[in-house]
């Protein structure tokens, strides 16, 4: 319908060829001090911009984002690598706010490197371009895994967890937060899949298999039947925070599914329902995708109709329009 046409037009107009990736406002801005500096927010926004790319057959529009990530991640001595070096880790990491020059600032967001890599893998999954996987995606995915090899620590149960992490954009910093665990799990799983495609079987892959076997997957059911957001702090029922960071495994990742384990799907439903339906446009779009994954078409449709209210915004936001296409 009309929203699909709008979404496709925005994608085609803001991300193709040798351009920079689509930012918070696509590429359209008419002021010197735009909201959030018209940057690349790594904790949902730039990723959500590209959710529709493959599923709407606009795969070529992915190129600017993939180029941006691979270039900055592998740039010797670049700002993303410097973030990792400050923590005595290989690889790279980013903060929440990032710009076209590779600058990264405001609140470190380590799991974003794993999240970005899921996009690199998704592009291969849709295109089956083995040359792209070998030359572009694999080098980034490998060094990102190495970052987490250096970063993860063993908890009291002998599982590997990400220390001192957050759940955007609220709550405490703890070890083993669901947001980080679920994304690192996806990274390791998809990197092993890439290794299988490329027939890579070396010391790195052996270490990856060993780490993956001990990795906490971030799926734990709490006292009121929900997917837990934190390990130590008890989740607050009725918390309407707009981020759904503890449900990364539901969407955009796929560890949670009724086809895999009904218990986790039901717990995800409890957690998602607790967030409520009211939110910003981009958050509502994310909820549409999550409810669709949980096979609740009526709830997804109701939220989608709310998200289509284009008169209810004060800032042009690309992710509002992109997020409603889920699969």
Could you describe each region identified by the protein language model?
Residues 18-27, 133-135, 153-162, 200-207:
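Short, glycine/acidic-rich hinge or "gate" loops at secondary-structure transitions
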Residues 42-78, 82, 98, 105-131, ...:
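Active-site core of glycosidic bond-cleaving carbohydrate-active enzymes
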